[in-house]
Regions:
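Active-site neighborhoods and metal-handling regions in enzymes and metal-associated proteins
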Residues: 1-412
């Protein structure tokens, strides 16, 4: 067999690097889906970030958010635990020099990526790990960052930082560093996907849809919501996916209002089931699509169910149809299909949003929620948007949730 997998990663059974399983690869090949080249995808991401740093005249960006670390290094380490225990960090200079702070300073989980030039220890400054010495530990880390900037001849010390503990921010500022908003830098950088990222997303979506196909087989009266949701989890992991961000699956009258979490409710005959995948799948790519299914043996759905579903479908279809490069966000907010007044109270939190490694910038609000100046941006090819709709009346019995993930191309 080949020593290289179809995505260019090592075909070595005992490798450390995570990734898609053979089941996923086989399904992609059968479906005729192009598989990404991970080396090219990683290089695109780093080069795009370098460009954005230089556009802002920044010396570099320091990130703690595990998804921003993933974007820069394509490495993982206990992603969910890390999301609330920030023991990792990553610095990239405006020339592309990458330093990763990881557990014990080990390159165990990053040696596969030659773009990571150094691995260091001790970026922690949170209470669980550092206790009442976190302030002094933050000062040590800040000195290290200053030394890095001096060593890179970064005389201006203009550093972007995304999400840092309060002692860390104070320590960096005490060293005379000029701190800028790293979250803005990373969100805007991540908003444009390269060719290989788009291939990776298509693969992730296909794997999610295969999981949904298996999930639908288990959608039977007498099953609990958790029974059904567990199938999506299982099928995601089987294919090399990573986790699910939310618990947005509900049945029957629990579909109204939306945002009730998946639980032990037993699904009855002739009910609807609505869910939002919010799934972090293969390659760490987010697949964020929503569907509402009918469960039971009745031939015809009720007139009310048809009314709700039709409106949700038309919201998705018509709002998607207006998307094209060159539009500004405000045009999307006030364009497309108007939401009927009777559904306004329970409207979803947005009409659309970006997506990549998770739900991402930009957010497209409903006109009633619009805040002038909050999301000033022009749509560009390579952006991916999720178009959403929740249709349900206040005090109503049921609601319908639909959502599609769409790529903006040169033509639409």
């Amino acid at each position: 067999k080949s020593s290289i997998k179809l995505d260019g990663s090592p075909n070595f059974n005992d490798r450390v690097e995570i990734g898609p399983t053979e089941l996923a690869f086989d399904e992609w090949v059968k479906a005729g889906i192009e598989i990404p080249n991970l080396k090219k995808m990683r290089e695109f991401r780093v080069n795009r970030l370098i460009k954005e740093l230089n556009k802002r005249d920044l010396d570099g960006v320091l990130v703690f958010d595990p998804l921003n670390i993933r974007y820069i290094t394509d490495t993982t380490n206990m992603q969910l635990w890390n999301s609330h225990n920030p023991f990792r960090a990553c610095f990239i200079s405006n020339e592309g020099y990458i330093i990763l702070w990881d557990y014990k300073g080990l390159n165990l989980l990053s040696s596969f990526n030659p773009l990571v030039k150094e691995v260091r220890n001790s970026a922690s400054m949170f209470y669980f790990a550092n206790g009442d010495k976190r302030k002094s530990d933050a000062q040590k880390f800040a000195l290290e960052i200053k030394d890095i900037l001096i060593g890179k001849n970064k005389g201006t010390h203009r550093l972007a930082v995304d999400k840092i503990q309060i002692h860390g921010l104070r320590a960096l500022e005490s060293q005379g560093l000029e701190i800028h908003d790293g979250e803005e830098v990373m969100e805007r950088t991540r908003s444009i996907k390269g060719e290989e990222e788009i291939k990776a997303m298509k693969c992730a979506i296909h794997s999610c849809e295969m999981g949904m196909y298996e999930m639908k087989k288990h959608c039977l009266p007498g099953k609990t919501e958790n029974d059904i949701w567990a199938v999506l989890h299982s099928e995601n992991i089987k294919r090399g996916g990573e986790w699910i961000e939310t618990r947005l699956l509900a049945s029957g009258q629990r579909t109204n209002p939306w945002f009730q979490e998946c639980g032990p409710r037993i699904i009855q005959n002739n009910e609807i089931l609505a869910f939002d995948t919010d799934l972090i799948g293969c390659y760490g790519i987010c697949v964020d699509i929503s569907r509402t299914w009918f469960i039971g043996d009745k031939v015809n759905i009720t007139p009310k169910q048809k009314e709700l579903y039709t409106e949700a479908y038309l919201q998705i279809k018509e709002n998607t149809s207006i998307i094209k490069p060159g539009m500004n966000i405000k045009e999307l907010v006030f364009g497309g299909r108007e939401l009927p007044k009777k559904y306004e109270e329970l409207r979803y939190s947005c009409k659309m949003h970006g997506v990549g490694l998770c739900d991402e910038w930009p957010l497209v609000q409903y006109p009633i929620d619009y805040v002038d100046g909050a999301f000033d941006a022009i749509l560009e090819p390579g952006m991916v948007l999720c178009v959403e709709a929740y249709i349900g009346e206040e005090g109503g019995f049921e609601g319908i949730k639909l959502e599609d993930q769409v790529l903006i191309t040169e033509t639409g």
